[in-house]
Amino acid sequence: MKEPLDGECGKAVVPQQELLDKIKEEPDNAQEYGCVQQPKTQESKLKIGGVSSVNERPIAQQLNPGFQLSFASSGPSVLLPSVPAVAIKVFCSGCKKMLYKGQTAYHKTGSTQLFCSTRCITRHSSPACLPPPPKKTCTNCSKDILNPKDVITTRFENSYPSKDFCSQSCLSSYELKKKPVVTIYTKSISTKCSMCQKNADTRFEVKYQNVVHGLCSDACFSKFHSTNNLTMNCCENCGSYCYSSSGPCQSQKVFSSTSVTAYKQNSAQIPPYALGKSLRPSAEMIETTNDSGKTELFCSINCLSAYRVKTVTSSGVQVSCHSCKTSAIPQYHLAMSNGTIYSFCSSSCVVAFQNVFSKPKGTNSSAVPLSQGQVVVSPPSSRSAVSIGGGNTSAVSPSSIRGSAAASLQPLAEQSQQVALTHTVVKLKCQHCNHLFATKPELLFYKGKMFLFCGKNCSDEYKKKNKVVAMCDYCKLQKIIKETVRFSGVDKPFCSEVCKFLSARDFGERWGNYCKMCSYCSQTSPNLVENRLEGKLEEFCCEDCMSKFTVLFYQMAKCDGCKRQGKLSESIKWRGNIKHFCNLFCVLEFCHQQIMNDCLPQNKVNISKAKTAVTELPSARTDTTPVITSVMSLAKIPATLSTGNTNSVLKGAVTKEAAKIIQDESTQEDAMKFPSSQSSQPSRLLKNKGISCKPVTQTKATSCKPHTQHKECQTDLPMPNEKNDAELDSPPSKKKRLGFFQTYDTEYLKVGFIICPGSKESSPRPQCVICGEILSSENMKPANLSHHLKTKHSELENKPVDFFEQKSLEMECQNSSLKKCLLVEKSLVKASYLIAFQTAASKKPFSIAEELIKPYLVEMCSEVLGSSAGDKMKTIPLSNVTIQHRIDELSADIEDQLIQKVRESKWFALQIDESSEISNITLLLCYIRFIDYDCRDVKEELLFCIEMPTQITGFEIFELINKYIDSKSLNWKHCVGLCTDGAASMTGRYSGLKAKIQEVAMNTAAFTHCFIHRERLVAEKLSPCLHKILLQSAQILSFIKSNALNSRMLTILCEEMGSEHVSLPLHAEVRWISRGRMLKRLFELRHEIEIFLSQKHSDLAKYFHDEEWVGKLAYLSDIFSLINELNLSLQGTLTTFFNLCNKIDVFKRKLKMWLKRTQENDYDMFPSFSEFSNSSGLNMTDITRIIFEHLEGLSQVFSDCFPPEQDLRSGNLWIIHPFMNHQNNNLTDFEEEKLTELSSDLGLQALFKSVSVTQFWINAKTSYPELHERAMKFLLPFSTVYLCDAAFSALTESKQKNLLGSGPALRLAVTSLIPRIEKLVKEKE
């Protein structure tokens, strides 16, 4: 065996020459590219999943009314079939390295195996007598690898044995599974942090190398991430981060187009939204494998389709149209249900394909070719269609549709082919690997130079190799920068995705809802400029970004590469500025030209640019993009009526910013299409029909529906039936008189007139510089202007031009000063509202704004921004009275929002409580619980806070509440629940609040005695001997805490003895939880307190000498600690009757279990008492009897306070378990049938596992309104008065109790709604 000579090299590689010829980085022509995009499944099994176009304008009006597209939301993890590979790779049979095209290959005589060198042939040659190698199993899919050449052996870190894989996709999938899984906790779970080794609540949980690491904070998470060099998985299209939810999730893999379609139909989960890059559960991520074997993740089906469409569009090569088979650059794309992409050259081909695709078997679709590029398609249900020109009815087969579309697009295809042949693909050179590439480059701007890379990996490697480091904005460490993000006008570098995500989250929490992302430059900023474009509200950081985005939106911008105007589909950030381009060709040409200019000396740059301008070829975009001049609306025109208008156009909504640009556009192409018979007619201003119509676009997560609007055509061709068509669509309108306006001349200033600043350029209006009067556009004539000067300002008739110029400058200065003053005033008022809102939310006195915030704000701005900024801060109105007025207005706005939401909710529940603990003022608080359909959940808000007289009855309380309910136009019949603390004035049988509300609510409201108050009443039931121990403990505590000297001396004594605690809590009867804490601390410090009381010669020291007394104290500390845990579990927001009843039942069963253990002398459930009894000679006979009697009485009192007959769960368990079979349901026969249907709904069953019970029933309203209403009437009522108690605690914390008690400031302190400050500021103007 020897190495072949140069002449024999061709013979050596003959067996696989065909394979080597196919190794290419990208397709060379349209035929190869079209072969790549051919789907593997039959069209009969596919569904169109999404429509997109280069022009990003909807073609819904062109599609069949009976044909609708639908997108499913992201759901479980899905493995979709990827786009077929573009090239076939050949590997060395020995070392498994890939053989590149043109590389010398070696093989044995009589064998087809290829090797990269003679060493590989020698090393891997084996005698025939050796036994066959053992079979290997793929580590990922566990399948046997039959062909040894397919084995890929890889050794991972921290793993000694190597692992085998059957393909590159299995290797990529295995590496993806080994990546760390991040779980974000929303509930506090106390564990030991893996980084700081502190016991704290777990914020993140990372499963890495089969070990679960708990992390307590963002700092520990970032440190763990950088220490282990981890990366977070994210969507390839939108960049949403992947994390695992805290609950159980189930992964599902789909391998066929049928499974994909079923998955999309059953998945109905709405993805969450967050600032910047959002978070997506890993169960919702879709896993695919590209042609190179790399595993890619997507957060939804929409992102997968959009990513593939973007890949096809950015390639810039010609593709065979799926309808007419013409090779052209694709202008429209259809995302099918199996993940494949169909490309089309025009909208006519899309309509033709849709008609053939959606036509049922055995039905002939009707289509009549009207003119070039136009086909009218009837709905599938219709049997025939009438031609627009008034001809006979004709039926056209799918083949004829394709034929007519191909014939109409033949001239366009020839032009596009000629232009495409002259286009040569420019390839760039990667700065790291020195490979040539023709894809969108990865850019790096460093030290005043631009660096181009073929991908993200090369960019990262270049940064590491050349130490491109900077200080990370989040972790404040000098590291290699991964990405730079712009926040509020400042570029912030980040060393990792985690730091960027945490910084964005902190930025969003700091600014709240005032923080928005600019639609143009993608920077996050609290500044907000809004503009509505074709019904969609866009937000921008400044006016400049809004104007640039508007020009891009209406396709009026020019390409930065070829300088042609039109749709710009590509953009890059070059030297800090955003550049826009037609397609990938222009991007590559621009980057190549800029790099060449940077390499040349300065005196040669202009020459190079001049040559480029001369030799630059026309862009393929302008020549190949058809101007759609006729689009038919298929929604409102009946099939049997003849419209007679063959050039009807759907008029798109164009804003004022683009109207001027549209009118000034050239219309030479349309003028050339006029018949010769009409050439004698005078030229008229034509409208750009390419802007008026709306081509196909991809709408995310919505179906592509036919446009239902049909309006009169904008055309200059006389139509025979134009009058009839106008009468059919809209009533006749009056003819408008054509106005001939004269343009402004500078000579008009001699008579004292200038152009009014607010007038339109198409019809300017003159304004007098003396009196400021504005005349109409028709008066823009010298005679009329001179007449105004002679009649009204005759004394100034002979003044020179300089006089009127001076008056003009004075008027301009006045207008600019007034505008600037109004702008500043608006910003100052907004700042005043923001400070007032934060003052009330922080429960601070109103005077703090003027006394503390304003002086420091002036000093800071003067020091940082200059004295002018400090002077501006002084003008912010922040007086005590102003802040109070601002708070009243903010509270009124929140109250208006609340009442509106309650009216939309229909059903609501109330929580009422009164208190007189604060400044001897009796306050009545009322909270309301309602359904917020905006966020699809239940909300709780403060309804009102009213000051009451000291002595008031239940009837008077009802009058106050009823007066407020009537003033807000709320209906008592919609009240489904009322919760109180059980006071006599609230629950009176005849004259109490309960009786009055039952009277007006027609017995529809369910009344609930607060669970926490009932639990407190149960805890107060003690035997006389135990109650005596409690009183004596309080006496000891009062002796120590009543004297400051005694407290200090006890603290010193505890510190000297090394005690864990050095002080005692203060006991109060009104504080329920303080009783358990006081007894526990008293027992823990019993030795220190005994020594202290003995030194003080107090008689109270004798109690600690009695072991039986100490044993009873230990038992009381244990039992009250357990009761405190139950009390805390009953507190919180959004609690339901079902949750609290379950917790009460659990405690009842624990009491029975403790009684059984007490009889067996087992006291492990009482740790303090068990420890003391084991370490002392305590006589257990008497104390066991006391404990048993107390537990038995406690169990009885719980049963009396929570009787089974008042348990609303009986017959209503279907609400919290709708997918389980229940014997007794309080439902009608119709509701039982609906519940059976709901239990079989797989979509709702998947939703039930991921949302709360209330959210589930709110989402089920559309499909099951009866069950929704029945369930919400049991879920809305309050079970506790916790919110009222929390509001009273907020009043206690405030320094301005008398002001907070008035209501507005208290509402801002406890509300979760955001006031509409922009609306309030506009009302001030």
Swiss-Prot record:
Q: Which residues carry this modification: Phosphoserine?
A: 397
Q: Which keywords describe this protein according to UniProt?
A: Metal-binding, Nucleus, Phosphoprotein, Repeat, Zinc, Zinc-finger
One Pfam family in the UniProt entry: zf-FCS
Q: Name one GO cellular component term.
A: nucleus
Question: Where does this protein reside within or beyond the cell?
Answer: Nucleus
Where is it made, tissue-wise? Expressed at high levels in heart, skeletal muscle, kidney and liver.
Q: Which GO terms describe its molecular function?
A: DNA binding; zinc ion binding
One of the GO BP terms on file: regulation of cell morphogenesis
Quick one: where is this thing mainly located?
nucleus
Function as written in the Swiss-Prot or TrEMBL entry: Plays a role in the regulation of cell morphology and cytoskeletal organization.
Q: Any idea what this protein is called?
A: Zinc finger MYM-type protein 6
Instruction: Tell me what organism the protein belongs to.
Output: Homo sapiens
The primary gene name is ZMYM6
